[in-house]
Regions:
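Low-complexity, glycine/proline-biased repetitive segments and flexible coils/loops
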Residues: 1-342
Length: 342
């Protein structure tokens, strides 16, 4: 078994088993704090009896003890919900993305968290129900929901072909009977980028939604932003792909959870849950456009501290992904978080 040092089993005619990897566990009074160097996988656990321990499970590095409590800082990633894709229209814009470090938060105080929902999609007859994504919040930091994709509009009403403004803007849709095609919506500075305009041709492409990393390019959704707060580099907030009026290849969603668009009568794909990706738009006919992906809030704090979350929030904790840190991924709900010494 891994991290037990157990010997592997022998064999007869078959293959023998390997031995388990080793482990190092160091126990010390809780008046001391661990400094853990890079290159090792470790977690620190408070025993609540006057002692804590650090358990090392892989790698090579350094370890020392100090009586100085490290400064309390919170690294954060706040991604809003992506916009819904347009019917006969453009891809939804990605949810706004904000990331950084906050050193001004206080221990034993409560801070609000809200995870934004993705915007809704619809078929062409129900196009008025297509919506932009909802905002995500951590403390005073708010990311704006992605703009909905532009939806077929005509001279006699119903729908708007211009992509909506959002964290990233939605892609433009079809102006039936009016000539031309809809413009992409603008993104919010510092959070995302603009959606693309629809193109005018014999087989119109509808615009892709903007992404957190780049604006949309024609029918394809903009790429999301790469972030490594969890210890693994991951794309978030990709724009949704735009629809295609007739048969052929519709727009693809941007890296970071953007949904693909569809051609005539097809169903597009939704933005990926907890990425803030925009939903894909549809082509002509009565195909159904897709919802945007929900947002996420990820918090990373030194492992000398801990976080407590209220009811109403769905949260996953990880104390081993990054040395010396506790990482909390909040994936749904509304509530509060309180920080304290571990």
């Amino acid at each position: 078994t891994e991290n037990t040092g157990g010997g592997g089993g022998g064999s007869g005619a078959g293959s023998a088993s390997k031995g388990g990897s080793g482990v190092v566990i160091i126990r010390y009074p809780d008046t001391f704090y661990a400094n853990i160097g890079t290159g090792v996988t470790a977690e620190t656990v408070n025993l609540n009896n006057g002692f804590r321990y650090t358990r090392f499970t892989a790698g090579t590095g350094t370890f020392s003890l100090t009586t100085t409590i490290p400064a309390f800082t919170v690294e954060y990633l706040v991604v809003a919900g992506g916009g819904g894709g347009g019917a006969n229209g453009g891809g939804g814009g990605a949810g706004g993305l904000l990331t950084g470090t906050n050193s001004s938060l206080q221990l034993n105080a409560s801070y609000n968290i809200t995870i934004g929902a993705g915007g809704t999609g619809a078929s062409y007859p129900g196009r008025s129900s297509i919506t932009s994504g909802s905002s995500s919040t951590f403390s005073s930091i708010t990311s704006t929901g992605g703009g909905r994709g532009g939806t077929e509009a005509n001279n006699w009403g119903n729908g708007t072909a211009v992509g909506a403004t959002g964290g990233s803007g939605g892609g433009g849709g079809y102006l039936n009977g009016s000539g031309g095609n809809g413009a992409g919506g603008p993104g919010t500075i510092g959070q995302g980028n603009s959606g693309a305009a629809a193109t005018t041709s014999n087989t119109p492409d509808y615009g892709g939604g903007g992404g957190a990393g780049a604006a949309a390019t024609n029918k394809n959704g903009g790429i999301g932003a790469l972030n490594s707060i969890t210890g693994t580099s991951t794309y978030y907030a990709g724009g949704g792909g735009g629809g295609l009026q007739y048969s052929g290849t519709a727009g693809t969603g941007g890296l970071g959870g953007g949904g693909n668009g569809s051609s005539i009568e097809g169903a597009s794909s939704a933005g990926t849950v907890n990425t803030g990706g925009g939903g894909g738009g549809t082509g002509g006919g009565n195909g159904t456009s897709a919802a945007g992906g929900s947002g996420i809030v990820i918090l990373r704090i030194p492992n000398f501290y801990t976080a407590t979350f209220s009811a109403g929030l769905t949260m996953t904790a990880n104390t081993t992904a990054a040395v010396g840190s506790r990482i909390y991924s909040v994936t749904a709900g509304t509530g509060t978080v309180t920080f304290s010494l571990a």
